């Protein structure tokens, strides 16, 4: 088992996609922070209206990195970090790499060769999950560093604006990013199609699923008369809704939801490699 994890980590580090995705993520993040610089130069009323529109729409379709810099609420580096992670911008790159890393073995025949040499085929999925968790950790650290560096360049004298709560926020977002990567890994293993898996990943990251969620929410609210919102029990929903200073109930819900989806994704992937010819 440990040998399989070490092998996947080594192969991951040697792939071009590993470096290509990380470099693309960093460049896109720097560009995004530079664009928020332009947003903050808008009049205060325009910034406030834009922020309110996203808040009212809640989980909107698309990716929006919106910050507010006014005299009453001066922009901090923590605001930039929150805006980027809650938008699921880094998640797109994490999911793209998850697809490329998971499907590549089926195309090259590597998994067929190594599959007969391991005691249990499920170890192949667990090792890939471990490698993707490491990649998500690296992406989280690099994303945060890129945001901080770009913020200090674009906004000279900007304050961090957060301490211990930022570390907790990033830790939970790392867990949820790993859960999303494992979900996409399961799709890739089940379909063995890069096109299908990337399409699912993009749809999840830009919130296409909210069309279905909104209908389900209305149906439950009509039957139970309760203010129910299923998005708060999904990984993508919690990535968006998690506040910078989360309460204990928010942390518990996010961690439990991520754990359930991670277990389900691993189970689906393991079942796929056991029942199908690899």
Segments and roles (model prediction):
Residues 1-26:
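Aromatic- and glycine-rich beta-strand/loop motifs that create alpha-glucan
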Residues 11, 260-278:
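Junction motif at the cytosolic side of a transmembrane helix
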Residues 15-16, 119-120, 192-194:
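Short loop-to-helix capping motifs
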Residues 18, 22-101, 125-192, 201, ...:
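Secretory targeting signals
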Residues 98-117, 121-122, 129:
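Transmembrane helix boundary and interhelical loop/hinge segments in multi-pass membrane proteins
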Residues 213-231:
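Extracellular/periplasmic helix-loop junction at the C-terminal end of a transmembrane helix
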């Amino acid at each position: 088992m440990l040998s399989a994890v070490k092998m996947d980590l080594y192969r991951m580090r040697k792939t071009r996609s590993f470096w290509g995705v990380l470099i693309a993520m960093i460049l896109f993040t720097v560009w995004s922070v530079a664009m928020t610089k332009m947003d903050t130069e808008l009049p205060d009323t325009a910034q406030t209206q834009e922020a309110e529109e996203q808040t009212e729409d809640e989980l909107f379709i698309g990716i929006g990195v919106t910050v507010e810099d006014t005299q009453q609420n001066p922009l901090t580096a923590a605001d930039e970090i929150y805006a980027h992670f809650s938008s699921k911008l880094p998640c797109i790159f994490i999911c793209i790499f998850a697809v490329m890393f998971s499907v590549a073995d089926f195309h090259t025949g590597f998994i067929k060769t190594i599959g007969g040499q391991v005691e249990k085929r499920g170890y192949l999925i667990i090792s890939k999950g471990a490698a993707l968790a490491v990649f998500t950790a690296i992406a989280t650290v690099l994303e945060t560093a890129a945001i901080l560096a770009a913020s200090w360049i674009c906004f000279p004298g900007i304050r961090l604006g957060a301490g211990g709560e930022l570390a907790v926020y990033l830790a939970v977002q790392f867990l949820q990013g790993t859960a999303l990567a494992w979900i996409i890994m399961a799709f890739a293993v089940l379909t063995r199609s890069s096109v299908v898996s990337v399409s699912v990943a993009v749809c999840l990251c830009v919130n296409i699923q909210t069309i279905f969620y909104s209908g389900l929410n209305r149906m439950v609210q009509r039957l139970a008369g309760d203010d129910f919102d299923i998005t708060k029990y999904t990984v993508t929903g919690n990535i968006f809704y998690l506040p910078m200073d989360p309460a204990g109930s928010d942390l518990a819900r996010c961690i439990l939801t991520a754990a359930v989806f991670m277990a389900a994704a691993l189970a689906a992937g393991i079942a796929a490699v056991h029942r199908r010819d690899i």
